[in-house]
Amino acid sequence: MSEKIVLIDGHSILNRAFFGVPPLTNSEGLHTNAVYGFLNIMFKILDEEKPDYLTVAFDRSEPTFRHQMFDAYKGTRKPMAQELREQVPVMKEVLQAMGITIVEKPGYEADDLLGTIAGMAEAQGMDVSIISGDRDLLQLATDKVKIRIPKTKRTGTEIEDYYAADVVERYQVTPKEFIDVKALMGDSSDNIPGVPGIGEKTATNLIVAYKSIENAYAHLEEITPKRAKTNLEEHYDMAQMSKTLATIEVHAPIEFDMEAAKLTDLYTPEAYVYMKRLEFKNMLTRFSDDMSQNDLEKYFHVYHELDEIQNFFDGFSAKEAAVSFFEDAGTVYGLAVAESNQNVAYLTCGGFVTEGYLEEQAQKLCDGLDTLVTPDLKGLLKHVRVTETKNCIDTTIAAYLLNPLKNEYTYDDLAKDILGQMVPSQVDLLGKLKIKKAADEKPEALELLACYQAYTCIAAKDQLLEQLEEHGMKKLYDEIEMPLVFVLADMEKEGVRAEKAELENYGAQLTGRIAELETSIYEKAGETFNINSPKQLGVILFEKLQMPNGKKTKTGYSTAADVLERLAPDYPIVSEILEYRQLTKLKSTYADGLALCIAPDGRIHSTFNQTITATGRISSTEPNLQNIPIRMELGRLIRKVFVPKDGYVFIDADYSQIELRVLAHMSGDQNLIAAYQHAEDIHRITASQVFHTPLEDVTDLQRRNAKAVNFGIVYGISSFGLSQDLSITRKEAEGYIASYFETYPGIKTFLDRLVTDAKEKGYAETMFGRRRPVPELSSSNFMQRSFGERIAMNSPIQGTAADIIKIAMIRVKQRLDREQLKSKLILQVHDELLIEAAADEEEYVKTLLAEEMRHAADLAVTLEVDVQSGKNWFEAH
């Protein structure tokens, strides 16, 4: 049986994959879809072919001998998209990591190298498969050389195969004659001119009849139609040059070592690292199970028995260590301690080794440390007390600041990104098992997982801090993010009291109103139907009731919120449907959902996250209290459910227009600054200027529209977006925005500068140095680029506002503690803070809260704070 070689046209397959696979990026912001598609095609080919040799050829950027012959060769091609260009070196690195031979040569195209190597291999009796999306390579097909043309589709990769006989069957000419057909008809993609006036049909007929261009010219007098004869007669030189341009050079002067192209194990440790970095998780399954085995494990020590665990604690004397409780869903499975990257211990919880015992010993250990390192300081604070003055390093928060675009910050990513090491991930160790089940079924794997996590923390800490320093974010980390951990930990511990009876009453109100809406909707529709079914709703609205602008998709008419909102002003039934949707969501999420979140102490203990959003805003989960609706009355009423404990009141403080005030400060626009300094109604002032109306004559509608413009500008709103928000024409929206920038010219200059700076630096930056990468700005896609520009404009403003809120939280909490007040900060929602205050401290705490929030940042305009109090959150807001 003959040996086989597979030859891949690198740029061609990469290009085909780029346009065939939807856009993908990894958590670093690197575009990966072309590499992903290329590898899928390559693996499919290798699985089918099982070759003995493999080589990938790439084009070079220098001109080739064809350019020297014809300056305009390939001159009509658009420049390579930046998203694809950045993937070419990555693709080469991945191939090299797999041990795959890459060939390229100045002055020659990949086609020439493939043709040359194919000839060598065929001469040695090998079977050859050439993989390319370029049909020019069909001229290389023989009985031993097969051309394979992949087509990337959503359903997978389909491949067309061509031996010499297949080319004849499909194109009526032999592979060698295929060159002449292309030379006569020309090729717009390569800008090969061909013979003017001769298309594919005429060219094919001529070559079928005469076998070559040379023979066609030898029988020129016989050629019909007359126009073809005349064109050939007048463009002889063009025909000859086009044939030379179209002919693949099969004797390129390259030194090719066939033995070096021998296919060995592609699934190397180096390739594994690349797959993890690119986040091609499904490709990791191709690697052997022992790929995750690591020499580091010789430094891991696991202790199960009480006496050996006690001996560990008794002998521990390090002043620096990584410490973390390994737990899941409230159950502690053990304690991981790494005093260096060569001494990692895991102390299991069970039997005589109780959670309380581990907490007691961990407390003593932490008290003796000068530097405490952990992947989750907030989680650790549930088990041990740590003073805010201790030198603490939270590796997750540090990693988040360095790259806030990631979805999660796992220890294996930290090892890869910071240490350049490959360590097994949780999936590698546990598969799909949850922690609880793994504790029973794979205890040793769970122990390794805890050790790897502790190892990565202690090993990465110095580099993390160095990178924060290099990126100018060490102060942000030290003075905002780390102190905030203690604030959030206390807030989670305190929780907020929820009144079950009030929650049931609220649910009953919603149920009653939902029933009223159902009845009214059915009456207006003339029949009952499933309001929650988009398909049934679409039929009612756009077929039965004949509403305009129905957009039909494969599954029926679109009944998305934006579609219904445009219809609502003219159709009462649509307004009711929108309200019905809002109320049913309120009932399921809050009336029903919150009841499940009330702990035995009668309070809801939400989890606050500081490593989730790209802008630096805090988010909350289980439950998400950030999304409590405020625009509709029934939505606001949910706040009545939240009440203070006996003898206490709620004090609520809300920043007034913080993002606009930040915009005024950062832009330095004198008109906006002056309006705030004179405590004027900023929306009314804007309306007066934008709509050229005397201040006293500004209507409520004009003020609302001006408010939409003010806040829309902060979010980089487009004329289209504003027109949708205000239900006006795009031209009117353009006029509003233009008038706005005439009123506040400094803002226009500032926003333009933000975009320019972000393009140059690759990131947007807040007043406090927080960075937000904006890879979308380098996209060749207009929509993506526009999105990136909006991010570049918004992130510095929204991020600065988020930083100010965090500073305010720290100041408030530290002052409450310093003055030993009974009142506690218990909740943060966007620009709003909620304190559960002792009744006898109410007035003092209101003053304290306002003072600390106002002085959280030194801006060119005052940070105004609205402070209210009440016997529930609704009253206090």
Regions found by a protein language model. Give the residues of each.
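Extended two-metal-dependent nuclease catalytic cores across DNA- and RNA-processing enzymes
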Residues: S2, L24-T25, G75-I254
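Conserved "right-hand" nucleotidyltransferase catalytic core of DNA-directed polymerases
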Residues: N231, H235-F352, G368-L372, L433-I630, ...
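Function-dense linear segments that define catalytic or interfacial modules
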Residues: V337-N341, L402-K432, L449-T456, Q610-P694
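C-terminal polymerase-core module
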Residues: G512-T519, E523-S575, E742-R790, N794, ...
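Conserved catalytic core of nucleic-acid polymerases
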Residues: K493, D601, H605, Q610-T613, ...
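Active-site palm subdomain of RNA-directed nucleic acid polymerases
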Residues: L468-I480, L484, I804, A808-V829, ...
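Conserved RNase H-like, two-metal-ion catalytic cores of nucleic-acid enzymes
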Residues: I5-V6, G10, R16-T55, D71-A72, ...
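Active-site-proximal helix-loop-helix substrate-binding element of RNase H-like nuclease domains
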Residues: R154-E158, A164-K182, L335-E469, I480, ...
